Amino acid sequence: MSDKKISRLRRAKKTRYKIRELGVDRLSINRTPRHIYAQIISADGSKVLATASTLDKDLRAGATGNVEAAGKVGAMIAERAKAAGITKVAFDRSGFKYHGRVKALADAARENGLEF
């Protein structure tokens, strides 16, 4: 593994530990060059409560690796969280910079009613 990836995983591990101490559900994201994925995971980490990604049928037809697609995923995860009765989460950016697609997903989720 490259040093860059090792550093990202170290940051992610530290963040997840802090979120676990808070005892709230977390909005975890994963980013690849082609897709972006979002999951809401229960406070104890045992269940995935809601998911959304650019692989969903609604988004698969268009561009999937850009800021616009990430915004749509953010809106979709917020809607699915509301349907599951979740309004407040902790944002787990998985060690990625809060910039570009990560920021677009977070902003769209906030605009659609998810609090973090």
From Swiss-Prot:
Domain of life according to the entry: Bacteria
CDD domains: Ribosomal_L18_L5e (cd00432)
Gene Ontology process terms (BP): translation
UniProt cross-references to Pfam families, sorted A to Z: Ribosomal_L18p (PF00861)
SS bond partners: none
Function comment: This is one of the proteins that bind and probably mediate the attachment of the 5S RNA into the large ribosomal subunit, where it forms part of the central protuberance.
HAMAP family: Ribosomal_uL18_B
Binding partners and assembly: Part of the 50S ribosomal subunit; part of the 5S rRNA/L5/L18/L25 subcomplex. Contacts the 5S and 23S rRNAs.
Protein's name in the database: Large ribosomal subunit protein uL18
